[in-house]
Amino acid sequence: MADYGVAVTWGDVKPGREKKALELWADSVGINEKAVANGRLDSWDAVLFEPSATPPAGVTRLFGAQDQVEAFIRSEDFQDVIGRASMLLFNVGVRRFVAGNALVETFGRYSKLIDSL
């Protein structure tokens, strides 16, 4: 698994937009699969949470090298998906994350900062 990624979270579907939300899901799966096949991302996955009174309802995680992830989230494909999602779903969010060795390095830098205080 790659050490960098972006998480796209979302809440409930806006009333009356359920069909379009399903179409968006299908489109985003296609875009993500194509990005992996073309080497633009290493992998991706998605999780739906059990119903709750608070968001998020689910998350899609996109993994790759830092430059891959940055290029992908700047792409027109990704920006269009996020724009459509914002019109169809409540509480759409996009956040970068680190994992694996990058997580270890991040905590190492944090530890050095603490020691410098």
PLM features: residue spans?
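Conserved short beta-strand edge segments in small beta-sheet-based binding/regulatory domains
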Residues: 80-98
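Short S/T/G/P-rich N-terminal loop/turn motif that feeds into the first structured element of a domain
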Residues: 1-56, 64-74, 96-117
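Residues that flank catalytic or metal-binding motifs in active/ligand-binding sites
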Residues: 56-58, 88
